């Protein structure tokens, strides 16, 4: 992603649009039971961004949810069509997690990891080169170094 270039995305009806003003940190596919239920699918693909780089335009509503670990998250949806746009997880301070397929160019963000594969549907086959984790991964050892450093610096600069 070039400097001064933004990524864009939207809901299905177009009432909510968003921009991401910096390169995303990491993209992952989650196979946990909660993600399966909320999406009605076998997994969801999420892209993590610094929370100050996500600019939302349009009316959204949110609801608080509990994750499988019991931690809280806040899910944000279009008020008109209900498209699930992004999540803020209590355990992911300083990051917002965008539903990757709402990005206009989502094909450019394949999963860099598959998490909670212990809950993966048995008929779903992942390629041998997929970076898979039965539960969550260690961010420092999984994310690209540049993304990890940028995230840590952001937390430090913003005293989080």
Where are the language model's segments positioned?
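A short Gly-Trp-Pro
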Residues: 1-10, 15-160
